Amino acid sequence: MKNLREIVKEKILILDGAMGTEIQKYNLTEEDFRGERFRDLPGMMKGNNDMLNITRPDVISDIYRRYLEAGADIITANTFSCQRISQADYHLENCAREMAFEGARLARIECDKFSTPDKPRFVAGDVGPTNKTCSMSPDVSNPAAREITYDGLFTDVCEQVDGLIEGGADVILIETIFDTLNCKAMIDAALTMMKKHGVELPVMISLTVSDLAGRTLSGQTVDAFLASLSPYPIFSVGMNCAFGAPQMKPFIEHMAQVAPYYISAHPNAGLPNEMGEYDEIAESMAPQIAEFIDEGIVNIIGGCCGTSPEFIAHYARIAEGKKPHQVVEKPKYMWLSGLDLLQVDDSVHLPVDASRFVNVGERCNVAGSRKFLRLINEKNYEEAIGIARKQVADGAAVVDVNMDDGLLDAKAEMVNFLNMIAAEPDIAKVPVMIDSSKWDVIVAGLKCCQGKCIVNSISLKEGEEVFLSHARDVLRYGAAVVVMCFDEVGQATTFERRIEIAERAYHLLVDKLGMNPFDIIFDPNVLAIATGMEEHDNYAVEFIRATEWIHQNLPGAHVSGGVSNLSFSFRGNTYIREAIHCVFLHHAQQVGMDFGIVNAKARMDYNKIPEEQLHLIEDVVLNRRKGAADELIELAAEIKAQADAAKAAAKAGGVAPKKPAAPEWRKESVEERLKYALRKGITDFLQQDIDEALAKYPHAVNVIEGPLMDGMNLVGELFGKGEMFLPQVVKTARTMKSAVSILQPHIEAEKQGGATTAGKILMATVKGDVHDIGKNIVCVVMSCNNYEIIDLGVMVPAEQIVQKAIDEKVDAIGLSGLITPSLEEMVHVAREMQKAGLRIPIMVGGATTSELHVALKIAPEYDGPVIWVKDASLNAGICARFLNEAECPKFEAELKERYEKLRQNYHEEQAKIASLSEARKNKLELF
């Protein structure tokens, strides 16, 4: 019987459809989910679909069977949340592996019943993304904090995949990925468990993007995501959830053009309507799926939320006999990534150079920058982050980070700094070069980055065994690598030794480990010239010769170097050093040097160096004549003396140093400046601008209610349009919090014994729903706006919400939910609040919620105000209106009028729509 790798080349494979919405059709009770075994377990179990593998295997097997009857080639095991971290919400951590095993085992049994030599059926062990993220902080005041780490997630998924393989999975499907670092940990776990079991299963990867702009929740573009995965042995990539077929298609088309893998797509049954339901039916969805198939952009097609066996039966018929997508070749260039893609090839266009050369920012290095070391020692991370931000603004396409100092905990500082810059989109957009002489520091750094990093560095200094071990880690964590020309004998200083070590290392990496040669960057050692020792004078020439040889003889490999080492003899003379670097790079780039660790801001223009100076510097760099180094030393002394004299004259004349010009946005009104600062996450001028605003507005709170909330509302609009993404919104929230902290003493001083906060808000994800990322963002934004937040977490029963609201005397309640069943639970919460005599405002939010659902289902059950909140940034402004005694009645009246119109329009539209049975009666009879 053919295996999956063989069949995928011959035909389009049919993946099954939704599991969750199919389970809902069985109308299972809490008792069904619990079974006898979990009868006394605390909390609510309904909604934990994975436990049905144990308590109602008949239901799960029946769903598998119906998809197989519909023609599915691949059955996705009901194991989406079989990780300890996911099952912790149900107190079932210790059953996670058992659930995974049973889910795969049940699928194996059904697939074996249907398999034939002509149509074998396969089990995909399903690994969902969890509801936690490795890349983002849950605490706005501490961007370095993480709710889960790479190692913790890796351990959980190892246990899950172990159960899946033992249960009979043929393939591992890692799906609905919203954070690439989560995905990398899951791939690592899958490959580790395969090695344990002695199997090589295909690994399918399916991401989901958060908006039509095409970024994941953690901020990566699709191209950056593909770059992050490029070092791994992936079987297929694709997309699921979030979109219906028409919205997903452009992304799948792009993947098919650039990704060297089989392509999968399993879209939702359209987009949820305002009632949280999916309007597409199998007949209407089929033509949309036919476009994917007929245009040859997929190898695997299936369904996600809202699809059913009926959908899959249609897809199977459409795909019959159609040619699958032809996989494109692996790219012949290097892919690196932060939040965005950096493609290093002959057409790369960078901010400083329109050439192939990649500037690697050198200033975030405690060994090379006294200022950066001081800031890290002082724990002044905000200013240290500013150094990284400035390098990127000045043209660095990669940022080197090094924390190697005898008085620092290098590992802790590396992790902390990388986590912090991950929260800075202006920095995180570029890849990171993790630089350390300590291997544990490098590994710890790799576990913090969702993008494809560069490791700096490995070498043969400790022999081949250590070299290969380190290289395997580079592959394991999905990075590119700098290889130093250093071996057991020592550092290479001649051309011959440089190319000998480079060639040996290249063949070990490419031939023995199978590393992509485009992911290898050689550093042939940039060493100081003009030191007074004749044997050093040819170091630059030898480097340039070695660069040319590597470029010509080691296909795909790149060349880098620490450029500032070259001019070490001239330290203290910035002009000469920059001129030497410029000349050296001019010649090295021409023969293949494509990376350089430099101060991007200090890049000098080769064509603007005075001719006499240029000839002299080239004589030194290229070692063209004896005595040139001594002449350059004399020139350097003259230039330094002139510079010192100019400084002294300026000081004596009272001439102040020229200040840099203020940015254009600083010329706007204080309101516009505050809005801009919020949108861009700039805190540098907050104190100055808030002081100006306080002089203009009668009360400190007016500054929050006015320009600051205007800025937050603008961010909300941009986020809704896909013009801002989540890391930017979180950065805005941090800036808002800083602004509020500046205003807080003024607010307190103006109070007359009143409350110390803007209001007390209770937040909860409703019973049956474990998703809390959106709720957490709301909590962050609200707390930044001076609201006291009581967060009850996830899976919160209505009774607990009501009782806590009464006990804490809260001013408003925020209800969150991601899945469709949460909509009905929100209605239940409103009923319980009505019974308890509460009339405080209810705010409703989450992916499946809508204003229409609030108007039709929730508001009629509750006499207090209920409002749908489109996104996190709007909550604070809405609360401010609700809690303002003068504004609240007017706001409630507006809501009632709007809801009445919505209900009226809805009922009118429904009256126009015939039922399916009526439509069939009214069909046109042609024969």
Each language-model region and where it sits:
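Domain-level signal for soluble alpha/beta catalytic cores
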Residues: 1-927
